[in-house]
Amino acid sequence: MLAYLFERFPKFSQTFCYREIAELFRQDVRPAIFSLRAPDRGPELNWDPAIVSAVHQLPEGDAFARLADEASATLSRAARRTLHEWRGKDDSLRLHQAAYIGARLQKLGVRHLHVHFAGMAARTAFWIKRFFEIEYSLTVHANDIFVPNNFEIGLLQIFSTVRAVVAVSDFAAKQLRDRFSDTASRVHRIYNGIDCDNFQPAEPSRPALILSIGRLINKKGFDVLIDACASLRNGNQEFRCEIIGEGPLSADMQARIERHGLGKQVLLAGPRPQAEIAARLSRATLLALPCRVDADGAMDNLPTVIMEAMASALPVVSTDVGGVAEMVRNGETGLLVNQNDPIATAEALRRLITNPELAQSFGRKGREHAKEIFSIDKNVRALRQIFAL
């Protein structure tokens, strides 16, 4: 039997995780699902109740402490000694979570555990393997591998014990193989998947609608997009721009819009349910995501919104960051510009707005490319080979 362990599930910003689980269910593979934390309380998650109700969420507070103590008492003498040695360390809770979850995995007959992100859940899986000898695999994404951390159990320890590491882009896979050459053979590239049939292109609205979606954080480059919109407005280009999402830079971005006098052109639309995002993609002229590499190494790798835009037959304006160039073929399915360059971004936007035939050609080719490399059916079947299912 297969199980999944998440730090938090369901979670609004991780639709790719839900899609993976839903496709496994469609393929008649029904993993047990464990979540270390309570589910996301963001916008409405219109997800299959059969999946959401199947999630085993860990108890909190005293209830968890009591159950974890009971589970820990059944561990081997060596495992109990390890628990004692780790008492008081920053990550000691992971060991108690491993004792609690591992005991339940054993009762369920789970032979393989899969985890997304090399963070809290992966460190818990490390200890589950240590205490219960249950094999695990890991899908890594972006900040969990690009940004250095000082966890007591880090990537080196995880990579030395994991059965397989799934990188969601060739860019990330090469980085990991270079950094962890001793375990390079364990690294596999499998893209996140999407069902393109859930995203249908429609006639774009007028005036041109520039759509951008993501958390309002520095690496997304929304400041660059707003500055590019100011350049478009100053050049008398008619357009609207909607930025969907929320985050710590919301107030800064609103102030930037007001400083440029873009209140009539640019809207911070806040978070929106997935169904509404799909509808807005179908009405947009293009997707813009001028992402950048942060000072700490944080960057996008395989932005889900670009997959969704391509599935919606939208041309994309972005940058050559992480795995974006594997998604957006420059001059074929969209336009790639340099990071932190609002002038080049504005020119790319203007080119697509003023040349609808080119934009439509890019969009059609982008949808074909998405169907080819992001097929949820094909990519989940590749995952199942790693799970030996």
Where are these regions (language model features)?
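Carbohydrate-associated surface elements
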Residues: F171, G193
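Conserved donor-binding/catalytic core segment of Leloir-type glycosyltransferases
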Residues: E203-A230, E242, L287
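Short hydrophobic beta-strand element within catalytic cores of glycosyltransferases
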Residues: I306, A311, P315-S318, V328
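Nucleotide-activated donor-binding/catalytic signature segment of Leloir-type glycosyltransferases, i.e.
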Residues: A251-A275
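Conserved acidic donor-binding segment of nucleotide-sugar-dependent glycosyltransferases
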Residues: M327-G331, L335-P342, R351-E357
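Acidic donor-binding loop of glycosyltransferase active sites
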Residues: S282-G297, L314
